[in-house]
Amino acid sequence: MIQVQTRLRVGDNSGAKELMCIKVLGGSMRRYASIGDIIVASVKEATPGGVVKKGDVVKAVVVRTKKEIKRKDGTYIRFSENAAVVIKDDRSPRGTRIFGPVARELRDRDFMKIISLAPEVI
């Protein structure tokens, strides 16, 4: 569960290291984001020479959350950190590599490029 002011690690090589959520997209009073949801975030920490700089406002998709989510078969999945991938307006990732595992739920939300770049889909 990601809400406004939540800090997330970045799971790609776009140049950002840490994001802070400033808006959850999808509804006027929407409060929480889960895996597969799009957020608007501010870059709080970045690597020098990256595509995005500190202070940039970017869109990102949540790929890992510490809060567990329930699947249709009754199992639960959770990760050890909150992480997101910076995306463009056409929902494709801004980086060329994805780090760490991503959840299978991204496939249902049509983030196939992120699924194909990820080293592990859980």
Curated annotation (Swiss-Prot):
SMART domains xref list: Ribosomal_L14
GO molecular function: large ribosomal subunit rRNA binding; structural constituent of ribosome
Record's GO cellular component terms: cytosolic large ribosomal subunit
Alphabetically ordered keywords of this record: Ribonucleoprotein, Ribosomal protein, RNA-binding, rRNA-binding
Cystine pairs: none
Assembly and binders: Part of the 50S ribosomal subunit. Forms a cluster with proteins L3 and L19. In the 70S ribosome, L14 and L19 interact and together make contacts with the 16S rRNA in bridges B5 and B8.
PANTHER family: 50S/60S RIBOSOMAL PROTEIN L14/L23, LARGE RIBOSOMAL SUBUNIT PROTEIN UL14M
Protein's recorded name: Large ribosomal subunit protein uL14
Protein source organism: Desulfitobacterium hafniense (strain DSM 10664 / DCB-2)
